[in-house]
């Protein structure tokens, strides 16, 4: 996260009941969640090779009374038995979309293999044992597929107060979500972009969307 979660919580006076983290990778943000008193965390990661890392982190953070649930699927606007996941030499750049301008900007990062994985709507994981009322913040980092994933969250967005997401101003991945796509989709659910940060390159960065007061 380029933008400090502590600063976000303080500036927008957020009370984080729980986080839905889509594209959890190796759980790098878990300590930040702990520092900001987040007790309920959902980690969704498409790359099955990273799940053991997340399970180990869950074991460690259980000692700090964090409730962590781990899911291995690609967050998508529909539920499918199989979808392609393109694994890259830097696993943080892996995506369900193929590299495009990313190859020009970061030529050392290449696709190394393709996995066939399940895809699922995020709003389908909630039930009597996993209550959406315990979650009000989405953190999404899935390399250009943000709109597809957020469409699969549409049934729970009324419960969400803030969304932190990676954004693209150019096609780093083939047919990737551009920031204006996110703006136009999320405004329908009452979210406005309040912070934009592009510290590494002008074509991509992070953004924070907050639900505007009614």
Regions found by a protein language model. Give the residues of each.
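Phosphate/nucleotide-binding beta-alpha loop and adjacent structural elements of enzyme active sites
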Residues: 1-214
